[in-house]
Amino acid sequence: MRVLIAGCGVIGTVYGAHLGAAGHAVSVLSHPPRTGDISVRGLTARDVLTGNRVETGAVVVPDAAAGCYDLVLVAVRADQLASACAELTGLQGTPAVLFFGNNPGGRAAIPAAVPGAVHLGFPGIGGVLRDGTADYARIRQQPTALQATSDPRLAELERALCRRGFAVQRVTDMDGWLAYHAAFVACVTAALYRCGGDPARLADDRPTLTLMCDAVTESFRALRHSGVTGLPRNLATLHSPALKLVAVWYWARTMSSPAGELFFAAHARHAQPEMRALAVQLTARLGNSPATSRLSELLLAAPPASP
């Protein structure tokens, strides 16, 4: 396939590098200074758990109208979504356009002016960019999520990722999945901000971990009561009221491990505008009531994280 990557942070770099290694022709939408480095060095990703490194060449294009593509992978932060969509209005033909990141508004947040077949998804990795290389790890509990659809381009994407060792799940209600996941992420990052963005500090702070888990449970319950479906099963189980102590223990262990930094803290510090926006959207959606008192306590009093 001819693939265009819009957004070359960790996610765009990792998935773009693997798609190139799988034999697909990868182009990258220009966004200096990052794409200046890509034009020279290509896309490079390193699995920090295995040490495996993948490199692929990529063509940097000045705008979305510069070529015809089968698949467009939009890997931008939620606060960059509107500007990314504006850049994509010049796409030629009818590509599959996969929005691949935090987006609690779901399909309704994507303007009709974006050409092609719009789909939703979410990555199954976390990591950091270091000197142009994306150091990453796969999240075993969260496979790459792709909208359940008959679009053959998403089927080819799934095949390519599976060949590259990625676990992939197809999600019927991707809109709901993204709403619940955004609520979860907003709570976790707010807890991290209370601890200066330091996952080790959060791991040792049981009152904040307990507040975080209470807030996640409340937000899930409020979304469910408002008619939102699509709650990921693993999160539904872990954050059921009966397993509160288990959830606190689980997140203490996770935050004290390398996963705390790779999967949560690094992005929380780097993308504070996005995380704040998720918290504001969640508060606006659920309101402030006794049923979400712990959620309000967590989100409304979270201080800025340390750089």
Feature roles, as predicted:
Residues E156, A160, T210-H225, A277:
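A non-catalytic, amphipathic alpha-helix used as a structural packing/dimerization or gating element
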